[in-house]
Amino acid sequence: MHDGFEMVARIPYPVTAPKFYTIASEVATMRFLRSSGLPVPEVYDYSPSSDNAAKTEYILMEFIRGTDLSDVWMELEEPDIVSVLRQLSQLESRLMSIPFPAGGSLYYTNDLEKVAGTTGIPLNDDRFCVGPDARVCMWYGRRSQLNVHRGPCTPLSDFPFVEPS
């Protein structure tokens, strides 16, 4: 672009399954983390459905120029390594402090409702919810054809227990 603006257009591999859940969850996760103050690229637009002019699912997101840590790690001096590790541990601490009500993948509530007919388990910010697990291991190959529960899964402590008599 003429003004230096750059963005990334991402489309899923043909074997990505299920595309809707994968794209919808990735976008919701990125936007949720960004709204929580974590340094995540901005998502400009997305479609978890192929029902659009491009005829494919997509994510249009901010391009961030930088250097891969793995490219410079071996040349870093000890103070730089300590600084990097401190920054990473601070980010991880912030990430792990975000409460989630259930196991599964993160979605925009309205996206999940469109495809699953359910709103999932809401977060404090009700734009977001926890829904089916979108990890590839849950859907790979013929697993995508199985009619099984993929989440959300509430913690065991939330299940009612009947005391033995």
Predicted regions and their residues:
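ATP-binding pocket architecture of kinase catalytic cores
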Residues: 1-165
